[in-house]
Amino acid sequence: PDTAKGWPDVPNFIMTDNQRMMRWIVDGWVTKMPTFMGKAGLGTMRWMDCSSVSKRPGDLKSRYSETLRGSGVTLEMVWRNMGPPLPVEVTKDNSATKEHEMYSVFLEAASAEVIINGTPLSGAVAERQFFGRTMSTAFLAFSETWVTPQEDI
């Protein structure tokens, strides 16, 4: 997201079957998250239509993958070696947007990769502080729900 270019020059794209909803998510959440705030690539990413999604959950301990296809691109995301389920409740003050509360169940992955048209992207899973503990930056979030606190409505 640091480069002001989009696909196919750099692997900077978003693939969705609901562009209107995804633009709402990007504008209302993603642009407010510290990881993406002010990043040159956020405004230049290419928006592509997704025509199919396949999921391979395996046993959810050793491997999980999702493959998206559309606009001439095949995107595969793979997570491996998951830890135990971790229920998460994040208050507005501790959330990435500082505007919403978030509830989810996370499965932390020890390793992960992103593959575009058969070519793995460079990079590695890192560790950082989440919820008072050191966690991998690669995890699955099941039933992730973002809400606006009642006092803000």
What are the residue ranges of the model-derived segments?
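Targeting-peptide/extracellular-domain and disordered-appendage signature
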Residues: 1-153
